[in-house]
């Protein structure tokens, strides 16, 4: 029986829930636990720390439908998307996971039951093939003896990638760490499609398609390459939703499943395309999925890192829309149809629909302004191309000047059977790439980061001073047993009052003290379940096992608490004033300021800013108790607690409430009552990206300082105007009105002087074949007056060519005017260009009027002297 994609997703989750698995929501496309990843690209990403032993959950079995993006970095499918049956920038990975619970037997039996069970997917058993790692006899025997697959459909795959354990059937997290063999399940579409089984010379065909990969994590790879058995083996599986949907819906291409058919029809509608087989429709249908969900997860178009990948995908989609004949912005119109086809997986996208649409529309409009010019330039270059390769320098110029990603240029070239010199492009990009590498940590070895086996207990909600024991020390990322005075290090304690940076709140500062030593803590960070105190040993020596007294900087923490509580009040106030579309997109809570990024499509009006301030200060005056409760995540959401989308929460969460005004999930530190905040003031509101606004605000003493500073400025101004602050507005208005009157009188005098100068100049014109030529350098004339003078002179002289120049602060300003009856022979733009070139400048304009600037004032006399000969030649 054919199932819809949404039904397949739900059936998978229901099946594993019936087998005792916790259904875990998809994590954000922006990984929050792995700096080595650009985007979430597999179901196991959100559980990586669990597999590494750095995190623990209150369940040992889990199942997910994880949103993934593969575009940029190691997994870059972008150039193939739309041109093959199964490449996507965005896909959903169905997965089931065991954290030291079941292993090979149950994992294989679960997979077989779901795929072939009459009440589940009911696939014909004879169509299923499997592969196992060459030496994994255990998995082989389970498939053969327990499941009953014939030997000829079980294929052993060895180290087929040129190194020990380098195999399609051996999975490794990195050079070190958890790894193990895997078994893959393939579906045979039938002999009407070309291709051979896995491991055969024809394996790249489309007949045998991998639908499920089951990884058995049973080893811990050491730095020397040896494999140590894990004490608790685990299971990580992944099945592409789109692939299994194609199988269950009896189609050979992912783009023919119900989800994509609906999206492709929507793309055709908004672009005006009638050919539903056009590959550009497939490209756009794929790209709207990745782009919409990336924006919903907080990624915005930019020229670096994740934002640049998003920009590349958007621009590729827009360019394909251009190829289909789209005459206006269209891409953002696909968000609505996408939400409809995603079903329950699109709920968060629906909540942010307006924001996502605005970001996509703005980016498309920006690109549309350069797309036409960029394509025209590329067409010119391709038309004069000798050979079949476009040079990298041209590709870079398109990128640098017109914002064309190189893969978009390659797309255009591929349609004409032309290659792009990507090596040349990379050479031209090297400086930017070097800077990007320095600024980004993406691609670092996850396993080389600080890893702490022990956990730290945070007790800073109730204590600012605590005795603890050193459980680990790190210098330059490496574990050490002891440090001496002057050394910088990371100190891990068994328990600590220091808050580690999280949720936008900065880490605590303070001191660790003990017998003969003092360690100054400049920052506090999380390392898995451990809390690291970063700083410098200012005196004595410190070693693992030492007892310490941990003292948090109390005054600094107090200011942070006020700012964090005020952030919650402001978030609630923004949603009241601007609407419930407001969602947090980033925050910083420090001891000096609070910064809050949120979704909103326009600048806030002064009245809205004042209303938010008033609402927050009203809650401060109410002196509400700030209460925290620990409860189940579902119960917290039912209570109305706001959760940050994409943030990882445990099943038991901390709910922070301020009366009936604000309820949020939060692990940060807060004031006891809203009245402790004292005063709240917004000091700035600005835009950070399309659809994202930023507010900076201060509280308590910081807020009072801004009040005093503002009062001092008003008093200073009043003193300058010889008045007092009470009638300051009237005084300023009077001064501005007097200034406007004086400026008007001054302009009248300048106009009179220019008119008189024009009258004097007209007598200096010379006759060239019936055309009056006037060339003059003017002293003491503002550049903006030159245009008025040219208009006056054209009226006085009739058939004429005029060139005027002036020099102000070493900069040359030029203007050329040509009467209409002469423009067929002398064009002002060409004339001014000739003169400007001689004075180190450039310019242009209409045939009858053109302007230019230059930097070489010394060359001006000679440049003006050349005009008569140039004009005379044109008039012959």
UniProtKB/Swiss-Prot annotation:
Gene3D superfamilies: 2.40.30.130, 3.10.310.40, 3.30.54.20, 6.10.250.550, Bira Bifunctional Protein, Domain 2 (3.30.930.10), Threonyl-trna Synthetase, Chain A, domain 2 (3.30.980.10)
GO process annotations (BP): alanyl-tRNA aminoacylation; negative regulation of DNA-templated transcription
Family per record: Belongs to the class-II aminoacyl-tRNA synthetase family.
Cofactors that this protein relies on: Zn(2+)
Domain notes per entry: Consists of three domains; the N-terminal catalytic domain, the editing domain and the C-terminal C-Ala domain. The editing domain removes incorrectly charged amino acids, while the C-Ala domain, along with tRNA(Ala), serves as a bridge to cooperatively bring together the editing and aminoacylation centers thus stimulating deacylation of misacylated tRNAs.
Cofactor note: Binds 1 zinc ion per subunit.
Reactions catalysed: tRNA(Ala) + L-alanine + ATP = L-alanyl-tRNA(Ala) + AMP + diphosphate
Organism whose genome encodes this protein: Salmonella typhi
Binding site for Zn(2+): 564, 568, 666, 670
Gene: alaS
Name under which the protein is recorded: Alanine--tRNA ligase
EC number: 6.1.1.7
SUPFAM superfamilies, per database record: Class II aaRS and biotin synthetases (SSF55681), Putative anticodon-binding domain of alanyl-tRNA synthetase (AlaRS) (SSF101353), ThrRS/AlaRS common domain (SSF55186), Translation proteins (SSF50447)
Subunit structure: Homotetramer.
Broad class of the protein's primary localization: cytoplasm
Keywords linked to the UniProt accession: Aminoacyl-tRNA synthetase, ATP-binding, Cytoplasm, Ligase, Metal-binding, Nucleotide-binding, Protein biosynthesis, RNA-binding, tRNA-binding, Zinc
Cellular localisation: Cytoplasm
Molecular function as annotated in GO: alanine-tRNA ligase activity; aminoacyl-tRNA deacylase activity; ATP binding; tRNA binding; zinc ion binding
A GO cellular-component term linked to this record: cytosol
Described purpose of this protein according to its UniProt entry: Catalyzes the attachment of alanine to tRNA(Ala) in a two-step reaction: alanine is first activated by ATP to form Ala-AMP and then transferred to the acceptor end of tRNA(Ala). Also edits incorrectly charged Ser-tRNA(Ala) and Gly-tRNA(Ala) via its editing domain.
Cited NCBIfam families: alaS
Stored InterPro entries: aa-tRNA-synth_II/BPL/LPL (IPR045864), Ala-tRNA-lgiase_IIc (IPR002318), Ala-tRNA-ligase_IIc_anticod-bd (IPR018162), Ala-tRNA-synth_IIc_core (IPR018165), Ala-tRNA-synth_IIc_N (IPR018164), Ala-tRNA_ligase (IPR050058), Ala_tRNA_ligase_euk/bac (IPR023033), DHHA1_dom (IPR003156)
């Amino acid at each position: 029986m054919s199932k819809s994609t949404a039904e397949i997703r739900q059936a998978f989750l229901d099946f594993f829930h019936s087998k005792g698995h916790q259904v875990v929501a998809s994590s954000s496309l922006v990984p929050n636990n792995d700096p080595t990843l650009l985007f979430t690209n597999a179901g196991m990403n959100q559980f990586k720390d669990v597999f590494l032993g750095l995190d623990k959950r209150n369940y040992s079995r889990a199942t997910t439908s994880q949103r993934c993006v593969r575009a940029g970095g190691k997994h870059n499918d972008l150039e193939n998307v739309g041109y093959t049956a199964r490449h996507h920038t965005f896909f959903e990975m169905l997965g089931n996971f065991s954290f030291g619970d079941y292993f090979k037997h149950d994992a294989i039996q679960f997979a077989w039951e779901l795929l072939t069970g009459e009440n589940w997917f009911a696939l014909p058993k004879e169509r299923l093939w499997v592969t196992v790692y060459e030496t994994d006899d255990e998995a082989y025997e389970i498939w053969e003896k327990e499941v009953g697959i014939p030997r000829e459909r079980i294929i052993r795959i060895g180290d087929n990638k040129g190194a020990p354990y380098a195999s399609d059937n051996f999975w490794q997290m990195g050079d070190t760490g958890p790894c193990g063999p895997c078994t893959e399940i393939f579906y045979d579409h039938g002999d009407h499609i070309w291709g051979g089984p896995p491991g055969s010379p024809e394996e790249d065909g489309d007949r045998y398609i991998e639908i499920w990969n089951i990884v058995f994590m049973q080893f811990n790879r050491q730095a020397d390459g040896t494999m140590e058995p894990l004490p608790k083996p685990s299971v990580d599986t992944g099945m592409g939703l789109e692939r299994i949907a194609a199988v269950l819906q009896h189609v050979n291409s992912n783009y023919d499943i119900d989800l994509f058919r609906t999206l492709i029809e929507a793309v055709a509608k908004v672009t005006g395309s009638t050919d539903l087989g056009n590959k550009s429709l497939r490209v756009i249908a794929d790209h709207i999925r990745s782009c919409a969900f990336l924006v919903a997860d907080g990624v915005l178009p930019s020229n670096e890192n994740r934002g640049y990948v998003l920009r590349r995908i958007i621009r590729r989609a827009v360019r394909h829309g251009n190829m289909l004949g789209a005459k206006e912005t269209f891409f953002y119109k696909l968000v609505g149809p996408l939400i409809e086809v995603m079903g329950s997986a699109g709920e968060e996208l629906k909540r942010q629909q307006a924001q996502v649409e605005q970001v996509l529309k703005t980016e498309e409009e920006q690109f549309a302004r350069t797309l036409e010019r960029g394509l025209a330039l590329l067409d010119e270059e391709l038309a004069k191309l000798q050979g079949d390769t476009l040079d990298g320098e041209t590709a870079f110029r398109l990128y640098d000047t017109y914002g064309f990603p190189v893969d978009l240029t390659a797309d255009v070239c591929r349609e004409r059977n032309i290659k792009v010199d990507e090596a040349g492009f990379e050479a031209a990009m090297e400086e930017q790439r070097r800077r990007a590498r320095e600024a980004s940590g993406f691609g670092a070895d996850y396993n080389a980061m600080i890893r702490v086996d022990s956990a730290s207990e945070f007790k800073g909600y109730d204590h600012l001073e605590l005795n603890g024991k050193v459980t680990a020390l790190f210098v330059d990322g490496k574990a050490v047993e002891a440090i001496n005075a002057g050394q910088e290090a990371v100190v891990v304690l068994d328990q600590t009052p220091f808050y580690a940076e999280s949720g936008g709140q900065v880490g605590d500062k303070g001191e660790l003290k003990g017998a003969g030593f003092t360690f100054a803590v400049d920052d506090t960070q999380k390392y898995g379940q451990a809390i690291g105190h970063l700083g410098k040993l200012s005196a004595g020596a410190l070693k693992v096992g030492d007892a310490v007294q941990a003292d948090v900087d109390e005054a600094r923490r107090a200011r942070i608490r006020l700012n964090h509580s005020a952030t919650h009040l402001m978030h609630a106030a923004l949603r009241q004033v601007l609407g419930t579309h407001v969602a947090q997109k980033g925050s910083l809570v420090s001891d000096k300021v609070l910064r809050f990024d949120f979704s909103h499509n326009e600048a806030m009006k002064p009245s809205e800013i004042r209303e938010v301030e008033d609402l927050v200060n009203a809650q401060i005056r109410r002196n509400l108790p700030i209460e925290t409760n620990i409860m189940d995540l579902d119960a917290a959401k039912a209570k109305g607690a706001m959760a940050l989308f994409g943030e990882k929460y445990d099943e038991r969460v901390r709910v922070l409430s301020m009366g009936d005004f604000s309820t949020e999930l939060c692990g940060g530190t807060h004031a006891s009552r809203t009245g402790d905040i004292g005063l709240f003031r917004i000091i700035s509101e600005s835009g950070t990206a399309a659809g994202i606004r930023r507010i900076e605000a201060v509280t308590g003493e910081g807020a009072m300082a801004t009040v005093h500073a503002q009062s001092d400025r008003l008093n200073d101004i009043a003193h300058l105007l010889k008045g007092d602050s009470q009638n300051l507005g009237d005084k300023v208005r009077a001064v501005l009105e007097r200034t406007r009157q004086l400026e008007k009188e001054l302009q009248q005098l300048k106009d009179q002087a220019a008119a008189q100068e024009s009258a004097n100049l007209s007598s200096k014109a010379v006759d060239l074949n019936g055309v009056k030529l006037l060339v003059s350098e003017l002293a003491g004339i503002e550049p903006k007056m030159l245009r008025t003078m040219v208009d006056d002179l054209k009226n006085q002289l009739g058939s004429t060519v005029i060139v005027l120049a002036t020099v102000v602060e070493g900069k040359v300003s030029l203007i050329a005017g040509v009467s209409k009856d002469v423009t067929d022979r002398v064009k002002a733009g060409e004339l001014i260009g000739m003169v400007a070139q001689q004075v180190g400048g450039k310019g242009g304009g209409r045939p009858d009027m053109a302007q230019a600037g230059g930097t070489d004032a010394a060359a001006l006399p000679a440049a003006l002297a050349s005009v008569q000969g140039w004009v005379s030649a044109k008039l012959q």
